[in-house]
Amino acid sequence: MARINIPVFLTILWISTCHLTRAKHLSHVSSLRSTISFKDCQNFKKKDLMKRNMKSQYESTSWGWNTKSKEKEMFEQSAWYLIVRESVSNLPVAFSHFRFDIDFHYEVLYVYEIQVEEDYRGKSIGKFIMETLERLCIQSKMEKIILTVFKQNQGARRFFREVMEFKLDESSPADTSEEHFDYEILSKKYG
């Protein structure tokens, strides 16, 4: 495992208390969450980081960018957050928005977002986040970890395929002569 070049520690935010009642394998994971309130979570401004990092990517696809829709998605009851903070200032430098879900009959940890502040890129924080999510996936007895990546985002595709060893998921849509998809679905299976 690569070492992170800056001192950081991890906080997992849990947005909703009703989520554990719906996920049979997750009762032992609740000890990982902090007591940070929903208000503190909103004050983190992760939506601003996500907008800075991803707005232009979305705008160049058929999906387009919709701020209200993205904010709604990020604050749904099923949302979990892994937040990396600098240990000296306690300021957030990266986050991942993820969910425990059922996807085509598989119990999965679905990574919705992984965002790193520009000044902290290239310091193995993304790899640290993904390795942490993989361990959480295994500990929670999920069958796979899954994510969606834009095809135009070559850096992200290279990171997930080459560094993290994700494969094209069987649910990923294939381009045809009539239809082109702006994204692909990648996954890594466990168990």
Place the predicted regions along the sequence by residue.
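Acetyl-CoA-dependent GNAT
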Residues: K45-Y112, E117-E118, M130, R135-L136, ...
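S-adenosylmethionine-dependent methyltransferases
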Residues: D119-Y120, Q139, G155, E184-L186
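Conserved acetyl-CoA-binding loop-helix of GNAT-fold acetyltransferases
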Residues: G122-R135, E162
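Conserved catalytic-core motifs of GNAT/GCN5-like acyltransferases
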Residues: T148, M164-I185
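Short glycine/proline-centered loop/turn elements that form peptide/ligand docking sites
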Residues: M130, Q152-A156, P173-E179
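Conserved N-terminal entry element of GNAT/NAT acetyltransferase domains
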Residues: M1-K45
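Conserved GNAT acetyl-CoA-binding A-motif
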Residues: I138-T148
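A short, internal acetyl-CoA/4′-phosphopantetheine-binding micro-motif in the GNAT/acyltransferase core
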Residues: I114-G122, F150-K151
